[in-house]
């Protein structure tokens, strides 16, 4: 399956982990999707989910300066996860920033409120 579908599953896994207040391990959360989606890139999903969880503080420090008059705590959980996930990928992969931002916008259109994709696009476009 595509990277796009794998990013969607990584997003859903991170959302699930945040909803469960980390009672679930990353491996347990990923195992829930393995049975239903054997063709996904689980190595990529695991790398992305683990990277976001392990680097949350650093990612938040990178994102926060670009949230004009907002704090990460005030954002929707979905927006916060999309920003962290995309920032991690921009900092730690060779995938072009444009591709990562486009995927983030698509995730926001699917999982966030109506116009939040514009906000996601604006924040990520300013992260280096």
Curated annotation (Swiss-Prot):
InterPro entries in the cross-refs: NusB-like_sf, NusB_fam, NusB_RsmB_TIM44
Superkingdom of origin organism: Bacteria
SUPFAM superfamilies, A to Z: NusB-like (SSF48013)
GO cellular component annotations of the record: cytosol
GO biological process terms, semicolon-separated: DNA-templated transcription termination; transcription antitermination
Coiled coil, from the record: none
GO molecular function, a single term: RNA binding
PANTHER family: ANTITERMINATION NUSB DOMAIN-CONTAINING PROTEIN (PTHR11078:SF3), N UTILIZATION SUBSTANCE PROTEIN B-RELATED (PTHR11078)
Stored NCBIfam families: nusB
Family membership noted in the UniProt record: Belongs to the NusB family.
Stated role: Involved in transcription antitermination. Required for transcription of ribosomal RNA (rRNA) genes. Binds specifically to the boxA antiterminator sequence of the ribosomal RNA (rrn) operons.
The protein's name: Transcription antitermination protein NusB
Species this protein is from: Staphylococcus saprophyticus subsp. saprophyticus (strain ATCC 15305 / DSM 20229 / NCIMB 8711 / NCTC 7292 / S-41)
